[in-house]
Each structure stands twice: as structure tokens, then as C-alpha cells.
Amino acid sequence: MRIIAGTCKGRRINAPKSIKARPTTDFAKEGLFNVLNNITTINKMKVLDLFAGTGNISYEFSSRGAEKVLAVDQQMSSFRFISEKAKELNLSIKCIKKDVFSFITKANDDVPITLIVFKLVVNILALICRRHKGFLLFKLIKF
């Protein structure tokens, strides 16, 4: 996998075989970021990457200037890999080792997250949310 744009543009990252996840393809990632760049600015965005796996999406957001990136995955191998790579690449990514559904139910509603990214099997589901009169409004984008 590689980082497509931003401060780490062109950097290749090889995930260990111990991570039982497939990284999002460059094609799918380019599609996601093309859509996002047309509807919002990534700079200063706060991102929650659920089922982070290899951290591929987290690295891309952080490289492109997202203010805060929080990666959540229950696998220790994913947690270690993302934490190590983020430090090596000097990217601002906080990694949490926890079951995603447990994390969601215990997460504080006031956490200022601009974008939530779900990756399930091959599909990428991006939930773009914004606060409106105290509620989170979601727009679903499926690639």
C-alpha cells in the first residue's frame, strides 16, 4: 500500500502478514478522497477510522492534514503496526485497541468527530456527519 497525497506522498507501507485485513486499494482510496475533496476540506478535519486494520485510511487522512485521526481496531497486531508506522512517518494518529462496537457504545457523544470511516470486507462506507442543533446528521457514501 502507498500514501497517495500529502506530506507522506509516495511512501510505501508493507503490512505484516499477522494483520488479518486487506488494505483499501489505491483505486478505492483515490475515489473516496476525490469525493471528499469536492464536498469538504480535509485540512483540520477530525477523523474516526473504525476497523482500522492496516491503518491505510488513517495514514492518508493524517498525511493530507487532518487535525486529529483516531484509529480503532481490536487486533493487537493492527494496534502495534498503526502505532509504530504513525510514529515512523511522524503522523498524528492515536490508535485504540478495542472492539469497535464496544468503543461506539461507550464513546462520548460530545467527541468532535467530523468524519467516521467504516471499512467492512471489500466495501468502504464513509459516514459524513455534521452537528446540527445538537444532532449528528449522516450522509452515506458507498463505493
Model-derived regions, located:
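Class I S-adenosyl-L-methionine-dependent methyltransferase catalytic core
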Residues: 1-143
